[in-house]
Amino acid sequence: RFTAEFDFRTYDAEGVILYAESLDNTAWILLALRDGKIEIQFKNEFGTKVTSGGKAINDGLWHIISVEELEHSISVKIAKEAVMSINSPGTLFKQSQGFLETKVYIAGLPRKVGNALVKQINPRLDGCIRAWNLMNQGHSGVKEVIQEKQSKHCLVAVERGSFYPGTGMAKFQINYNNLDSAEDWLINVTMTIRPSTDTGVMFALVSNETVPLALSIVDSNSSDSQKIIVTIGSITVAQLESKKLCTPRKVLVGLLVTKQQLELSVDSHTDRSNTEQLSTLHQAMMANVVTYLGGLPDVPLGATLVTAFYNGCMEVKVNNRQLDLDEAISKHNDIRSHSCPLIMQ
């Protein structure tokens, strides 16, 4: 019979923890998180079922989760206490010559499966799993795979936020148009940052091979401060110096742009500009722009001043909407959407 037990920690509200299927794909079980609560979906020869229950567990604390197939039901426990018992006629997976063989996927789904689920889910999950015991065989099989992949190792202590390791970016399609007027648009970005290195692109708009707007952190001449700059193409249109950006404290950065004016704020300091370069940005906004967080795609040399990937923690709101990296069109695998390394002070 199918059994799985492990310790689990996350701040993420939705995603796939584990998916197992029979070798011929006729039966499967999905263990997932939705609205922070455990959800089970399964299919066998008798039909399909979806059930969720228990309290929300996306609180960043460790929880012991177990799923066990019993004679006529599937039992789900959190911290050894039953939170769900799902009636299940027949066994989940049929034995073959006395053996139970299943394919198990952790923190994701095989490509073809998404549409076959009883209830659709965003599979991306940022969490940590330890103390594996699959099919009562301990962590054999799982441990070897994880040990070889540095990016799959858990951080010891985490807090809420998103972590960019300096190796990639996330891509979004965002509509900046102001509904009142076709010619009007608004870019209102607020972010909380805790950089780990002194140079990198935090937020950028890309139009074809140009970068009509970028918000970056760059090293300054002074040893204990960095600059936060706004560029249109390769021209700096606003900048502010900030002392000791790469420290445990979080810094609040704001960028407000209309076709008439641009305003950059860092903590309580502000730099305003109504440069003629805004007409370049306006032309791009009238066409099509793609939003990037944490870096840039390949653009021609000289298209912009900073091309390095951002390294550190960052949470971003665009036009008052918190961006969820799980909803990005694409995102580098090493970016952690919902957890940041905790700095011990």
Where in the sequence are the language-model features?
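Non-catalytic extracellular/lumenal binding modules and the flexible linkers that connect them
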Residues: R1-Q345
